[in-house]
Amino acid sequence: MYHLHPCETLRQVFAARPFQGAEPERASFIFVGLDANYSPDIEHSAIFPQLLEYLSDGVAFWRKTGVHHPFLLPAYGNKDGAKYHRAFASIGFRPEHAPLVSFVELLHLPTYGQSKLAVGDLDAVHLRWVDRVIRAGSARYVFIPGSVASRMRQSGCFPWLPREPESEGGSLGVWQRTTTTTVYCHYHLSTHGWQEKKKREQIAEIRALVKDA
């Protein structure tokens, strides 16, 4: 179950480009999530114009502002989503990496509140597109948390995705490795507590991949 975001403008912009950042088909780094979640009153936020600008052209936004997401703008403060994007920023991507980085969600619609996605909530056409992006696009590195991978397996649209990632000795697990693309398993970037140490180790390993990009 999910709560469809009430802002019509946000829904329209997201429908035209159901991803965030660079075009996924051309990106080298793809981060797969469950849904794009926003505050229910985001339309009245000081950063709403910048959010629409970002969703319309994430690459241009990053180059213009120096931050990869409007939730990192000072006017947004410490509201929902800021923690995730601060953790993401610690990876070390810079504005010149903007054309290489994309965020793709399993749900094709923007949401608000707490989502508990079931397979029936997901659109098969969108999921097949996600599969093509991962397996037939330009991605060198794809990052899928375990909770997201679980929904992907349940959908039946990703038969290549194993039940458990392989360990290659580092903190990142590996869902799949081909001659062109490595699909990694990592902790969600908003996790904390006992997962924090390993999450930081995983971020350091992703940072090393960025240096080679």
Language model segments and positions:
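C-terminal capping/extension of enzyme domains
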Residues: M1-L10, A118-D131, S150-A213
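Extended, charge-rich low-complexity interaction segments
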Residues: I134-V142, D212-A213
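Structural motif
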Residues: F31, F143, V183-C185
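Acidic, glycine-rich loop-and-strand cores that form catalytic or ligand-binding grooves
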Residues: R140-Y141, P145-R153
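A polyanion-binding, active-site-adjacent surface
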Residues: M1-S138, S147
